[in-house]
Amino acid sequence: MNNAVGYAKPTERSNKILLGTDGIGADMIEEARIAYARLREFNVSAEPTTVWQWLENSLELFPDAKQDVVSFDYDFADSPWHAAFTTNMNVTDVEIAGEKVLTNSQPTRVDLQEVRAKANEQALRLYERLS
């Protein structure tokens, strides 16, 4: 839906559907919530379980992800129905292949202050070149 790519009415085709993101948002629960709302535009009887299956189908591309652990600040984030009707469910912790990469909503592998400082330096440098 971003970048004016449109909406393909995915349930009208027989091929397997996977829900993903092009990186602009990268919030897959929010993408699923929006996909469910869009699905209901042309099928009012559609259920969130359809879209949830699209999320699960993506695990076929990344089977190792089945072992990863993702925790949310909402107790029922693993429910298709709750995910479809609840906004602002935030990831709090992520463990990938036994390594904690997000703890208390903060990355563990990078220093955010350093990343932001370097990004600011580069933005100023670019601005100077463009001026």
Where are these regions (language model features)?
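Active-site microenvironment of metallo-dependent hydrolases
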Residues: 37, 53-131
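Active-site-adjacent C-terminal substructures of enzyme catalytic domains
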Residues: 1-77, 85-86
